[in-house]
């Protein structure tokens, strides 16, 4: 299906600016009518300081105004400082009812029911029905996802979907709590941090849009650090809006 054909069927399209291709893909998409909408945020809770050292260095070394040896030294120093910060804010081990499932064993109907009962709390977002999750998560051949489910009195009240990336960090793909309850989110995040520690995983992380108010609040409460915001402060370079949206002319919106 071509883009012109798709425009007749759908009203909104989402894509990225193509940062890997040095922005070339983003330039093409803007010519098609996409609008730069938001920047990416990358939240991290560090368990092993070497992970953050490598992460900071990988971002700073691409900034030409900072010499490579300074980027390396600065990354090492900052990761050491941050390791003390994360130790100070390491959460108590949660005592709730948590159950971990592989992607082929998760109770999909329970998850869909939780979503249907609470989707009004989450605004415009993907519809987390079991059919979508099976396609997006369970049938994804590139990642081995794990479902972490939180129960209270044998009733599902929240979940997180995570995968282990190539840098030995848990990446949160999705997280949801009944009534968007922050106390439930806090318990889930605490469990993920301890789950990572016990499994020898270096960090818990989540990549999302900077403007996602719910996730920003969740990760701020739980003392995660937005690496992209930190890099922006060090380099004094404003974050580019790499998330692009195409709106059908039928939709009235303010740009």
List each language-model region with its residue ranges.
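Alpha-helix termination/capping residues and helix-transition junctions
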Residues: 7-9, 142, 198
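Generic alpha-helical secondary structure signal
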Residues: 23, 109, 113, 131, ...
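Conserved glycine-rich acetyl-CoA-binding loop
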Residues: 1-4, 8-9, 178-187
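Alpha-helical structural motif
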Residues: 66, 73-74, 78, 107-114, ...
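Long, low-complexity segments enriched in small/aliphatic residues
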Residues: 85-101
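Polar/charged alpha-helical tracts
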Residues: 5-8, 58, 83, 109, ...
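Active-site/acyl-donor-binding loops of N-acyltransferases
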Residues: 13-87, 136, 146, 152, ...
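A conserved beta-strand-loop-helix scaffold within acyl/acetyltransferase catalytic domains
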Residues: 19, 96-178
């Amino acid at each position: 299906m071509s883009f012109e054909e798709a425009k007749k069927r759908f009203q909104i399209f989402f894509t990225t600016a193509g940062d890997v291709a040095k922005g070339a893909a983003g330039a093409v998409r803007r010519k098609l009518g996409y609008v730069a909408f938001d920047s990416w945020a990358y939240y991290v809770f560090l368990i092993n300081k070497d992970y953050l050292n490598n992460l900071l260095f990988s971002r700073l070394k691409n900034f030409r105004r900072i010499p490579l040896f300074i980027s390396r030294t600065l990354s090492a120093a900052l990761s050491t400082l941050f390791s003390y910060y994360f130790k100070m804010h390491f959460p108590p081990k949660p005592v709730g009812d948590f159950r971990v499932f592989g992607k082929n064993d998760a109770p999909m109907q329970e998850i869909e029911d939780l979503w249907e009962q609470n989707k009004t709390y989450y605004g415009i977002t993907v519809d987390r029905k079991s059919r979508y999750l099976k396609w997006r998560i369970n049938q994804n051949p590139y990642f081995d996802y794990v479902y972490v489910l939180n129960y209270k009195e044998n009733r599902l009240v929240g979940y997180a979907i995570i995968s282990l990336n190539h840098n030995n960090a848990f990446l949160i793909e999705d997280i949801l709590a009944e009534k968007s309850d922050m106390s439930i989110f806090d318990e889930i995040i605490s469990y993920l941090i301890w789950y990572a520690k016990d499994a020898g995983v270096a960090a818990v992380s989540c990549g999302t849009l900077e403007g996602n108010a719910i996730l920003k609040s969740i990760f701020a409460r739980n003392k995660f650090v937005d690496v992209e915001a930190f890099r922006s402060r060090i380099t004094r370079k404003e974050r580019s809006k790499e998330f692009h949206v195409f709106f059908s002319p039928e939709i009235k919106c303010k740009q």
